[in-house]
């Protein structure tokens, strides 16, 4: 990426764009905002003037019941009742405006403000997402993403539907795709993180379905009562217009209309279902609601699958950790005993190689560097101090040698306090070919004025050869390594190298950590059960059971922690 100061300033300005207070909507939809207490209209889109045949300024201050009929307002009140702030919810359909045209009304509440979004009602019957959900369930985890792309295309009619997963560096990769031939395939291509800036990702978490009916639409500005203390927060408005940079991005891609459906796993944005069309395309509120439900169901399947894999992996690693502890327990010379448990210790963590540096000696297993490389890793770790964990996925960070194939990433944890003993974990180099949708080092172009950036104009596949790095170390990897360290320190507590440093070490820290993690998994399971909605009575019984188990685990963690 360019290091030009003007380019960086423009790029920073793009990343800081306050798109949640953009102050305009996409027509032909209309936005009305009124105060929950008092019912006074405090904001309205400019095109409301045409719908209600009055000046938009004349709408401000009017009681909402004089503008919207009571039956539709009752549906709005029901839709927002007892709900926390969140995305607009389809309230119903009613006659609106001077000529009583049929409009779908969606609504959400934000504090004392109620947002009503009105869209012309379609005469077509809304899709049945039930068959799509069954199709996802019948394909199993391996076929889920392709089935999701196909079912979204069937429900929405978009030319290209891609399932796009975010990776550790913020970039995204297209893992599945459904095409009808009007747009080119992007399957297998990767997009740089800068394509979706942080503030946009935050909004994807808040509002799970977003549609742009026409990238060339003229936004309708929102007028608001000057007494409102701040610009109107439009985070949850489905009609909210889009950053001009994003619209230009879509036009450069040859896309005339788009829609995105968020995939959320463990409370984080896992990815998107990105839908593109070769010509403008309206998606009615009923269809968006069906696609929202389908996206949430797919998210639940992904979340459950990830949780199941995590539990299975950690159970296997815990068994290996227990094996290490059992074999070292009671040995007169635990250091000598370590030679026989290094393979089990390696299996207890997510690494390709392990080195224990004890009393100036190296004990190693798996894929590790030569002696000189181990010394280089130790120097790198010592320079970062013994008070924290040090890790890197880049071989050049710690190893000056050219050959880092067998040991590229390193995670270093000090053993004991006040001594030079270390636990080193290594990961092999991951050489790979990445196909980018356009050059990742040229994600933007500076406009002629030099004041703003525009998106790139080419999305042609560009090949990059990646080497010199391993799979990155995640927080979970560090936690597993720390647990192994506890086991090793406990076993070595009576040896000369660590004497006096670990007299208080016992099994409690590991037990407390595992109890807290079991509790966290139960909370996540409860969230998945909420999503499954098996029936109120059954769900309440499940929650009571989970709460009881969680209390027991919490007591264990509190006692042992």
Regions found by a protein language model. Name each.
Residues 237-241, 276-292, 424-426, 430-480, ...:
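Regulatory loop-to-helix N-cap segments in sensory/regulatory domains
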Residues 208-254:
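Active-site-adjacent "gating/activation" loops or surface patches in catalytic cores
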Residues 21, 29, 136-162, 166-167, ...:
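Signal-transducing coiled-coil/dimerization helices and immediately adjacent hinge/linker segments
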Residues 166-222, 357-379, 387:
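GAF sensory/regulatory domain recognition
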Residues 25-125, 159, 170-173, 177, ...:
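Sensory/regulatory domains in signal-transduction proteins
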Residues 1-15, 321-334, 340-459, 472:
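Terminal helices and disordered tails flanking the catalytic cores of nucleotide-processing hydrolases
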Residues 108-125, 206-224:
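Conserved oxyanion/phosphate-binding beta-strand-loop segments in alpha/beta enzyme cores
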Residues 128-134, 228-232, 317-325:
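Bateman (tandem CBS) regulatory domains
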């Amino acid at each position: 990426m360019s290091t030009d100061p003007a380019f960086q300033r423009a790029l920073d300005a793009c990343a800081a764009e306050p798109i949640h207070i953009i102050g305009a909507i996409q027509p032909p939809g209309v936005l009305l905002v009124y105060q929950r207490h008092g019912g006074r209209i405090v904001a309205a889109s400019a095109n409301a003037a045409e719908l209600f045949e009055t000046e938009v300024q004349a709408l401000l201050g009017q009681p909402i019941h004089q503008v919207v009929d009571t039956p539709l307002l009752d549906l709005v009140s029901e839709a927002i009742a007892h709900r926390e702030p969140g995305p607009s919810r389809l309230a119903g359909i009613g006659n609106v405006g001077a000529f009583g045209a049929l409009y779908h009304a969606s609504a959400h509440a934000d504090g004392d403000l109620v947002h009503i979004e009105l869209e012309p009602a379609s005469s077509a019957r809304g899709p049945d997402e039930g068959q799509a959900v069954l199709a996802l369930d019948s394909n199993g985890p391996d076929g889920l993403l392709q089935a999701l792309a196909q079912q979204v295309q069937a429900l929405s009619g978009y030319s290209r539907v891609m399932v796009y997963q975010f990776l550790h560096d913020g970039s995204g990769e297209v893992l599945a795709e459904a095409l009808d031939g009007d747009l080119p395939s992007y399957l297998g291509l990767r997009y740089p993180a800068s394509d979706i800036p942080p503030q946009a990702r935050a909004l994807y978490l808040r509002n799970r379905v977003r549609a742009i009916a026409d990238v060339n639409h003229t936004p309708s500005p929102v007028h608001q009562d000057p007494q409102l203390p701040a610009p109107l927060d439009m985070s949850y408005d489905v009609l909210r217009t889009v950053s001009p940079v994003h619209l230009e991005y879509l036009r450069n891609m040859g896309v005339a209309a788009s829609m995105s459906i968020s995939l959320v796993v463990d409370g984080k944005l896992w990815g998107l279902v990105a839908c593109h069309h070769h010509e403008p395309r309206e998606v009615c509120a009923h269809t968006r609601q069906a696609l929202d439900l389908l996206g949430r169901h797919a998210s639940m399947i992904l979340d459950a699958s990830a949780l199941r894999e995590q539990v299975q992996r950690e159970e296997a690693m815990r068994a290996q950790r227990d094996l290490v502890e059992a074999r070292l327990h009671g040995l007169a010379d635990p250091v000598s005993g370590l030679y026989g448990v290094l393979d089990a210790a390696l299996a207890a963590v997510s690494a390709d190689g392990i080195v224990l540096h004890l009393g100036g000696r190296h004990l190693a297993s798996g894929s590790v560097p030569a002696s000189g490389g181990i010394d280089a890793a130790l120097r790198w770790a010592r320079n970062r101090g013994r008070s924290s964990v040090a890790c890197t996925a880049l071989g050049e960070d710690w190893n000056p040698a050219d050959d880092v194939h067998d040991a590229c990433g390193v995670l270093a944890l000090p053993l004991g306090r006040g001594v030079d003993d270390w636990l080193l974990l290594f990961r092999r180099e991951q050489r790979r070919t990445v196909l980018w949708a356009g050059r990742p080092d040229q994600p933007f172009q500076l406009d002629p004025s030099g004041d703003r950036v525009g998106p790139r104009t080419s999305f042609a596949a560009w090949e990059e050869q990646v080497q010199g790095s391993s799979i990155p170390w995640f927080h979970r990897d560090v936690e597993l390594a720390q647990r192994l360290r506890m086991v090793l320190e406990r076993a070595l507590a009576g040896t000369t190298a660590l004497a006096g440093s670990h007299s208080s070490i016992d099994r409690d820290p590991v037990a407390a950590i595992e109890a807290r993690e079991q509790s966290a998994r139960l909370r996540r399971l409860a969230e998945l059960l909420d999503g499954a909605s098996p029936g109120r009575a059954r769900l309440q019984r499940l929650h009571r059971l989970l709460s009881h188990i969680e209390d027991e685990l919490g007591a264990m963690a509190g006692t042992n922690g």
